[in-house]
Amino acid sequence: MSKRVQVIGAHSADFVWRAGGAVAKAVAAGGEAEVIALSYGERGESGELWKQEGQTIENVKRLRHAEAEAAAGHLGASFRSLDLGDYPLQIDGDALLQIADAIRAFAPDVLITHTDTD
């Protein structure tokens, strides 16, 4: 039986080290996988990009999106970001609805995300 695996992470690169193996295994077994990032990590996880002269937040987001999309693609998953911002990443009522809608739309058999203390 193939599984639908959905990964929801705070930042665009979180899924690689948190769930990459599970995603690859599910896809190899004929399942589907979707990765959702709440944020691109444009402020807190993109230090090297900010060292480039003339860097902009829009460009950092574009680069982070391309990196995450490529990584997800290598694992056989789709990728999208809710682009909720970073530092601070605040989850308000609208953000919760976006997350709930994404879960309902994909209807995963397995949902992988952060622990409640992460």
Segments from the language model and where they lie:
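Active-site rim/loop-helix segments in enzyme catalytic domains that contact anionic ligands
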Residues: 1-106
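Acidic beta-strand-to-loop metal/phosphate-binding motif
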Residues: 110-118
